[in-house]
Structures are given as structure tokens and as C-alpha cells.
A protein has these predicted regions:
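Structural signature of extracellular appendage/secretion-system components
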Residues: 1-344
Length: 345
């Protein structure tokens, strides 16, 4: 809806403009292009002045300025990722609060209208809450009369008001559900800060994918900017050959190693996955303690657990992924671009 689109684009624009300030390069502030050009100009001057000591110091100073610039941008991006993470938390708290208020108003409206009264003021209040919610997440509402179960044609004069967010029921008459945020124990990207939140439904523990294509509103924008990788997360397929999945002993413990073929990341300079983290196979998450990139371009991940023979058999040829494909240029994307430049420099 229009409200959701407005919430999405306003929040996205706000944080994109902040990121843009980190890459400013103009007369008021020297940025990447200027610092890089200055460093190479100083290097060229050094070569043409028989490596004069003062000129060499000037080159070293310009190289240090470039390094300081990259460190500063990285720090700013990570701090912004923390700000986004905190806003996700406060936004979820607000969503839960709105759901609670709507459920309470539903009851108040029915208490007034069952006795023949008019609850216009309460209905207006509820409509404002729904408008606020729809700017955060996609909202669907329905209101149907409640009838006598013994006499279906008998209208009781009260209604059941339901609110769904992203297709899932959040308010059901007088009852409501809440979302929970849980800090990740493992990083997805090398440069992620600790404690990024994932969302689940509090009652079922089922994941709530706030960055999915079906989402809208400001909550999606927050996740896009915090986790956006330009749809370039790690993917691949476990090999089908013998030895693609095998158990081994590490530090006295039996664990399983899986070899991933045809990975989406074949250039080590572009590699951004965490040294240890979570790999997803058959919609289940598994912790890995480390990984190696093999000479043939495949990857071998050492899981923190031992898979039984049945599990190993099911894994053969299956797709794997690390993190989600988030089609937005968020913090991970810019951090990855900087790392890629520095590794190839």
C-alpha cells in the first residue's frame, strides 16, 4: 500500500543519505578519489626526485591518510549498523505495542456497540493505529460480524476485527501475538558487528523474514540497510562424490566436513563470509567452526557437530547458503567493496 511504500522509501533514503556522507569527496572534505590521486602523485614525484627524503615522507603521509580514511569509513559504517540494529529493536517493540492496543480497543468497541452505542471515537483511534502500523509492515485488516453459533442468522451486534502483517495474523479479535528479537550468536559477514537481531514469532519461534520481497514498510528498509549484500550472499551445492561429506576428528571430537561445489564466490578478494558462522542446508542452520578454500575453487566447511549416516546421505547434492540474499546496497555491501579494493590494491 501507499503508506507502506512511503515508510519503506523514506527510511531507506534517510540511511542512504547518511552512508553517502561517509564517501564525500569535495572542496570541504577529501575523500577516496582525492586521497588516492594524491598518493599516486606523490609516488610519481618520489620516483622523479631520486627518492628525496622529504618527498618520500610526503608519500608516506599520503598513504597513511588513505589508510586513515578507510579505517574511518569502516568505523562509521559499523556504528551505523549498530544504530540500525537498535532501531529494529525499538520498531519491533512499537509493533508489539500497537498490536496490544488494537486488541484492547477491539474489546472496548464491542462493549459499547453490543449495547447499541456508537464507538466512533474508538474506531477512529483504531484506524490511526492501523495507519501507523501499515507504515512499518504490510497490513491486511478484516472485520466480520459475530453470530450466534446456534442461530447463524442472528447478528449479535459485535464484530471480530483481525489484523495480519505480511500475511500472518497478529491481532485476532481480543487476542494478539508479538514478535521477538534475538541477538545472533554467530556473524554472517566478516565485518558484521556482534549481536545483530533476528526476528521470530514469540509464540511459535518461527522466523519472521523482514527483508523478504513480500515485505514493505520501514522495518524492511531497516533490515535492507543493515544486512543488504546486493543479493550476493554465499551459495553453492554440496558435492555428490564420495568424500564430499565425511566425518573427521578435531580436538578429540568427531565432526562432519562438507565440501561445497560451484560456489557463488570464487574470488578470494570478494570473500566476505565470517571465519566461523552458520551455513544453511535443507532449510536448517548448522554452525561451522572454520572453512578452507580448495585449489579447485570448492570450499570445505567443518561443522561443529557430527551428522549421522542418514543425514550425510540426504545432504549429497543439496544447495547451501550463508545468510540471505538481500537485494539492497546496505552496510555489508559497502564493507565488502572496501575490503575487495584493499585486498586487490
Amino acid at each position: 500500500n501507499n503508506n507502506g511504500n512511503l515508510g519503506l522509501y523514506q527510511k531507506r533514503l534517510y540511511y542512504m543519505e547518511q552512508i553517502q556522507t561517509y564517501f564525500t569527496d569535495d572542496d570541504t572534505e577529501k575523500g577516496f578519489s582525492t586521497l588516492l590521486k594524491t598518493m599516486f602523485n606523490n609516488l610519481d614525484t618520489t620516483q622523479h626526485t631520486n627518492f628525496d627524503e622529504n618527498v618520500r615522507k610526503q608519500f608516506i603521509g599520503s598513504a597513511q591518510s588513505l589508510a586513515t580514511y578507510f579505517n574511518g569509513v569502516a568505523t562509521n559504517l559499523q556504528e551505523l549498523q549498530g544504530t540500525l540494529n537498535n532501531e529494529i529493536k525499538s520498531t519491533v517493540d512499537n509493533v508489539n505495542s500497537i498490536a496490544e492496543k488494537i486488541a484492547l480497543i477491539n474489546k472496548q468497541i464491542n462493549q459499547v456497540e453490543i449495547n447499541g452505542g456508537h464507538a466512533n471515537e474508538l474506531r477512529d483511534k483504531r484506524a490511526l493505529l492501523v495507519d501507523e502500523l501499515s507504515a512499518i509492515v504490510p497490513v491486511e485488516i478484516s472485520e466480520v460480524p459475530i453470530t450466534n453459533s446456534n442461530y447463524p442468522d442472528m447478528d449479535l451486534g459485535i464484530n471480530k476485527y483481525t489484523v495480519k502483517i505480511n500475511g500472518q495474523t497478529m491481532v485476532d479479535g481480543y487476542d494478539y501475538r508479538t514478535l521477538s528479537y534475538e541477538a545472533r550468536e554467530q556473524k554472517i559477514n566478516q565485518t558484521d558487528i556482534d549481536g545483530l537481531y533476528d526476528l521470530t514469532w514469540s509464540d511459535t519461534g518461527v522466523k519472521f523474514n523482514a527483508a523478504s520481497a513480500s515485505m514493505g514498510g520501514s522495518l524492511r528498509a531497516l533490515f535492507e540497510m543493515r544486512d543488504g549484500n546486493n543479493a550476493e550472499n554465499f551459495t553453492g551445492k554440496i558435492g555428490t562424490e564420495a568424500g564430499s561429506i565425511q566425518n573427521t576428528v578435531v580436538d578429540g571430537r568427531t565432526v562432519t566436513q562438507i565440501t561445497v561445489k560451484n560456489p557463488s564466490m570464487t574470488d578470494v578478494e570478494k570473500l566476505s563470509i565470517a571465519e566461523q558462522g552458520i551455513i544453511t542446508v535443507l532449510n536448517n542452520d548448522y554452525l561451522y567452526s572454520d572453512f578452507t578454500m580448495n585449489a579447485d575453487g570448492s570450499y570445505t566447511f567443518t561443522l561443529k557437530q557430527e551428522l549421522n549416516a542418514s543425514q550425510r546421505s540426504k545432504f549429497l547434492g543439496e544447495s547451501v547458503s550463508i545468510g540471505k540474499s538481500v537485494d539492497a546496497m546496505g552496510i555489508p555491501y559497502y564493507m565488502s567493496q572496501m575490503n575487495q579494493f584493499l585486498r586487490s590494491f
